[in-house]
Amino acid sequence: MKDTIRQLIQQALTRLTDDGVLPAGLTPAIQVENTKDKSHGDFASNIAMMLAKPAGLKPRQLAEKLVAALPADASVSKVEIAGPGFLNFFQNSDALARRLEVALADERLGVRKHGDLQRVVVDLSSPNLAKEMHVGHLRSTIIGDAVARVLEFLGDVVIRQNHVGDWGTQFGMLLAHLEEKPASAESELADLEQFYRAAKKRFDESEAFADRARELVVRLQAGEPECLRLWQRFNAISLSHCQEVYERLGVRLTPDDIRGESAYNDELPGIVQALRDKGLLTESEGAQCVFLDEFRNAEGNPLPVIVQKAGGGYLYATTDLASMRYRSQVLKADRVLYFVDQRQALHFQMTFAVARRAGFVRDDTALEHMGFGTMNGADGRPFKTRDGGTVKLIDLLDEAEQRAYALVKGKNPELPEEELRHIARAVGIGAVKYADLSKHRTSDYSFNFELMLSFEGNTAPYLLYAYTRVASVFRKLGREIDEIDGSPAPEAGQELALAARLAQFGEVLGNVAEKGLPHLLCAYLYDLAGLFSSFYENCPILTADTPARQQSRLLLAALTGRTLRQGLELLGLEPLERM
């Protein structure tokens, strides 16, 4: 609907330009927003205030001319001028009903992407295989997964890339420890964190062990078969730990999505040579660097992107440049989205700039850093165990399920044990994910089990329960929610408000895909659940006073249920038929 209004405004602007009211050459970004107060219409635009100055008119005068120049459209019942010159558009209720009818008849709820379909690479999760996945990996994994799901739903081709840290000097230390204890390695590797700490302790305390670790790094980098065998064994065990976490979280990541740092090893000398051939390299204290004028420190000195150390070793930037070239030139990506901590913003700004300057990425490939904030404890500090250690992600999920189990059993002690466990898993894991996804991506947030497992407020339990309320209506009828289709005829205020919000699902998903912000979908679903609750309490469905009204309200309920279910699934949550 917003696109329709933008087109109508653009036609009016063209007409006023042709009539000499507006000067030629204006290309304003036409903004159309949803109104909060529906007595002021469904949509509003400030275009008259934006263009009043170049038109040499007062905003309200220009607004009057715009309204007069607007073409008639069946989806708009009327346009009013409010305040200093806002244009308020009222949606035609018949046109709204037709949009809902289309949504009900379509398994994709009438949602289509506006604009061309694209190939999108999503870089997400990317844990360091030297350690077990911890809470710091949660945000990249689930935010990236949610955005990837939305992109796919809109029709884009999505290529997930799990850029795991499977290479580097720390692996020499781990291989040395693995080599020392071949018999007990399997059992010790069951706890990667403990294995890493033990190897680090040996490295710090034994000069001979440290020398052996450094030697193994050199041999590993040289491709010595026995070192590669130990390295591959360690990585296989570490990756199996990661896959267990992904399956518990319900994210769409598989071993096929892994392309770690080591995959680019053979390309790194060529990356450095290509930068040299382009005249971009400068030697600084023995290291090979790229200096770009647009990146300077507080003293005004250029900042380096170091691509090769004085000793010949390569850095993260070198590997990132190789991956950017691969994703643009080989995977043919139109967009590459990097779901990586906000603290890496400068690193990505600089490597993106180098990649473009060097010609590693096509001009039409968009490189986008989707940075995120930190997950903190209740005290506002980085989330840690009581003894100050790192919290394993699998331990966090275990506790979430245990707490959810106690909560669900307390409310429904009569449920069979298997069903209790299933509900607890969906509620517990869903609560952890939703508490994160519902926050703005770039914000820090405090982790709090009590708040996230509450049935009140913008939480997973509240939304999961909202869906079960809709499902219960159709269970009482003995009908499936997906069987219901037709054209609703919303009349009452609560019906119209619910209908208008349902029609905005596609627009919300478009914004999530464009901006990489899942919290927009969370806010929409929370609002939708609240509107349904008001509708349910004020507009009887099964006891409606006429068959036509009952059918119309059933259609609204069905579309609400399907939209909630689809939205929850796009966030990576499991909808439940009953709780």
Curated annotation (Swiss-Prot):
NCBIfam families: argS. SUPFAM superfamilies: Anticodon-binding domain of a subclass of class I aminoacyl-tRNA synthetases, Arginyl-tRNA synthetase (ArgRS), N-terminal 'additional' domain, Nucleotidylyl transferase. The keyword Endoplasmic reticulum does not apply. Signal peptide: none annotated. It catalyses: tRNA(Arg) + L-arginine + ATP = L-arginyl-tRNA(Arg) + AMP + diphosphate. One of its GO terms (cellular component) is cytoplasm. GO terms for molecular function: arginine-tRNA ligase activity; ATP binding. Its EC number is 6.1.1.19. It is an enzyme of class 6 (ligase). HAMAP family: Arg_tRNA_synth. Monomer. The keyword Disulfide bond does not apply. InterPro entries: aa-tRNA-synth_I_CS (IPR001412), Arg-tRNA-ligase (IPR001278), Arg-tRNA-synth_N (IPR005148), Arg-tRNA-synth_N_sf (IPR036695), ArgRS_core (IPR035684), DALR_anticod-bd (IPR008909), Rossmann-like_a/b/a_fold (IPR014729), tRNAsynth_Ia_anticodon-bd (IPR009080). The lineage of its organism: Bacteria, Pseudomonadati, Pseudomonadota, Gammaproteobacteria, Pseudomonadales. This is Arginine--tRNA ligase. Pfam families: Arg_tRNA_synt_N, DALR_1, tRNA-synt_1d.
